[in-house]
Each structure stands twice: as C-alpha cells, then as structure tokens.
Swiss-Prot record:
Enzyme class: transferase
Name of the molecule in the record: Sulfate adenylyltransferase
Matching CDD domains: ATPS
SUPFAM superfamilies given in the database record: Nucleotidylyl transferase, PUA domain-like
Source organism per UniProt: Chlorobium phaeobacteroides (strain BS1)
HAMAP family recorded: Sulf_adenylyltr
Length: 404
C-alpha cells in the first residue's frame, strides 16, 4: 500500500525552497528590496512552506483565505485549512508597499534573509475575532492569543520564494527532516501506515504507552517533536531530543519508530491545532495522528478531549490522515501497569496520573519523581538539565495536568 497523499487537490508535495543558481539570483535580487521582518512564528511558517510541510499553500494567506480559515477551516478554493498562515507588518511599512511589489523576508531575531514575497494583498484584520474563533478565547494570558495581538497592524498576502531553512538542519541534524525525507524513510522501512506522535515535552510513561499502542496498530511511528519556540518553562528541543533517544534505545524494538522534528512554534490552539497537526503530518506521510488528552492545549482553556471531538465535526474527506483517539492513560498500581479509562476498572486512588506539566513542576522544584512516572534514563537527562538552570521558571499546574 502506498503512503497517504499530500494535502490538497493536486496530491503532490509543493516545496517552495529554492536551490542552485536560482537561489543565488533571487538572494542577490532580494538585497535591493524593502525588508519585512518576520517573527519567530512567521519564520517557522515560512520554512514549513519551503519544505512542503504546508502543501498546497504557495505563500501567506490573503483576506479571503484568512477569513475562510478562521471562520470555517476552509480556504476560498475549498481547501481544508484550520489555522490561518499569515504575515504581518507595521502600518507604517505597509503604507509604503505597492500591490505587486516584491519584498525581502528577514528573520527578526537572527537577521537572516529567509525568502522573498510578491505582495498581492494588504489587509487589516479583527485580531480578537481571529483569536475567539481559533483559540476559543481572546484572553492575552493565552500565549497563542498574545502572539496574534502582538502582530503588526497590516497583513500581507502573496506567493513566496524560500531561501533558507534557518539553523534547523545543522542544529538538529538527524532529527529535523523534510516531508520528502520522512516519506523516503517510511518507504525504505516498508511502512505504509504510520502514526505521528506530536510532542513538545520529554516523554513520560503515558507518552511511551500511547506510542506503543500505535505501534501495535500501524507499521511504525514517527515521534515528531516541535523544534521551534515554546512558552517559558517548557523544556528545550535539544534536551527533549536526547531524552527521546534514551527512551527509544532502551524501551522500543529497533525499527518500530523514528524520531523527527519540524520547525514550527507552538500556537497552543488546542483542538484547532490538532487539526493542523494532522494536516501537515499528512504531508510528512503519516496516515494517523495520535491524539491523547488535551492535545496542543495550555492551561484550562480546552476540555481534555476537545481535540478528539473536533475531528468528528469536520467533513469526512477533509483529511486523509485520521486521528488515533486514545483515552486518559495512567499507571495503575492494582493493574500493575499502564492502563486507560477504557481498560482499568479501579479508582483514582489506585492510579498515578501522569502529565508533562506535573513532571516539569516536580523537576523544577527539585521534588522526587514517583516510581512509574518516567524511565530512569530519561529522568537522568532531565535532572541534569534542571540542575544547570540559573533561573527557574514557575510551572503552573492546571486541572487536566493534575488528573482531575
């Protein structure tokens, strides 16, 4: 059986990353263009456009696509897209740009020239409306809402040419992969059904259990970690990479799973982000996305299984990648092993509730981590990381993390 098709009507990957002489010529031309500075989130989105992770998009969205994505998860041409992919700038710069003008796209943090874009549209948006639709809140305490509210006043829409993947290929060599690379690896392994496990945390026993359930169902699993920016207090990607490698080496059958990484920042959009995670995993060649408790959530903004329910609300043909919906999982002392609400008849006093937030809080505060919470090889790496921190960030517990 072949792998799932890339997303979109054409069913082919559309990487927008230039190479060779064309790249050199376009980079030279871009030196004389007006510069639009990119936020970290926008740079990650541009790189995903470059590697084909956001197939079939050809650039940053114009107004009709923004509106359709925000309100109906649907672009103007009927393509399913659950979160808008947009570029913003100041009104001051926007007023100087003409329709049809080409601009250079520069990462604001590093100053690196990342690409170019033809400005086909300039438009203003109701940011609070976008936040209420996508995040289900306009509270700026929500990190994703804060990102949107801090955007420039004007959105620019148009096709892009991508020049660089930033530091990801060198900084995360062997983990950072393009959709073409993951697809080639799956085919080399003889996999046709592949489940993606989304993670922004080091893997504890519940994560391990979810992946092993998926291995029983599918040919293999892509442990696909986010390599872009997170919120304060989250554990950086290099530490996660080492801890995931330790887990795979000691507790998984060789050849059943692969660790990969992708260049996006977290949006913390909960159910909507779960849909985006499934969409771009389809481009990476994954037939399934593991969706556990509070997928892509933050705080108490979403119910623990809202991300399960949203897949039942979209058109059946919206995505080829399907969710593997897995119930609340935990360690049960009476069962003497990992279990879920579907498999364990015992009460909460017999269960050890596991969460990444709880693990980070215990490690940050120097508390002893209970047996069965995480593997010792993983804890060793995490304890070393926390011991080296000069400044601790308070980790706030929320309802789902406490197992309530």
């Amino acid at each position: 059986m072949p792998l799932v098709n890339p997303h979109g009507k054409d069913k082919v990957l559309k990487p927008l990353l230039l190479s060779g002489e064309e790249l050199q010529n376009e980079m030279e031309k871009a030196k004389s263009l007006k510069e639009v500075r990119l936020s970290s989130r926008e740079t990650g989105d541009l790189i995903m456009l470059g590697i084909g992770g956001f197939t079939p998009l050809e650039g940053f969205m114009g107004y009709d696509d923004w509106k359709g994505s925000v309100e109906n998860c649907m672009m103007a041409d009927g393509t399913f897209w659950p979160i808008p992919i947009t570029l913003s700038t100041s009104k001051e710069l926007g007023d100087t740009l003409g329709i049809g003008e080409e601009v250079a796209l520069v990462d604001d943090e590093s100053g690196e020239l990342m690409g170019s874009m033809v400005v086909e549209e300039k438009y203003e948006i109701d940011k609070a409306h976008e936040c209420r639709e996508v995040f289900k809140t306009d509270n700026i305490e929500h990190p994703g809402v804060l990102q949107v509210m801090q955007q420039g006043e004007v959105n620019l829409g148009g096709p892009v040419k991508v020049f660089s993947e930033g530091s990801f290929p060198s900084e995360f060599a062997g983990v950072y992969m393009t959709p073409a690379e993951t697809r080639a690896l799956f085919e080399k392994n003889g996999w046709s059904t592949v489940a993606a496990f989304q993670t922004r945390n080091p893997m504890h026993r519940s994560h391990e259990y979810l992946v092993k359930i998926a291995i029983e169902i599918c040919d293999g699993v892509l442990i696909h970690q986010l390599l872009g920016k997170l919120k304060p207090g989250d554990i950086p990607a290099d530490v996660r990479k080492d801890s995931i490698n330790a887990l795979m080496e000691n507790y998984f059958v060789k050849g059943t799973c692969i660790q990969g990484g992708y260049p996006l920042d977290m949006r913390y959009a909960g159910p909507r982000e779960a849909l985006l995670h499934a969409l771009f995993r389809q481009n990476f060649g994954c037939s399934h996305l593991i969706v556990g408790r509070d997928h892509a959530g933050v705080g108490d903004y979403y119910g623990p299984f809202d991300a399960h329910h949203i897949f039942d609300e979209i058109p059946r043909d919206a995505l080829e990648t399907k969710p593997l919906k897995i119930d609340w999982t935990f360690y049960c002392y009476k069962c003497d092993g990992m279990a879920s609400m579907k498999t364990c008849p015992h009460g909460k006093d017999d269960r050890l509730s596991l969460s990444g937030t709880k693990l980070r809080k215990m490690l940050s505060e120097g508390e002893e981590v209970p047996d069965h919470f995480s593997r010792p090889e993983v804890l060793e790496i995490l304890k070393k990381y926390y011991a080296g921190l000069e400044e601790k960030v308070e980790v706030k517990m929320h309802t789902h993390a406490e197992g309530k």
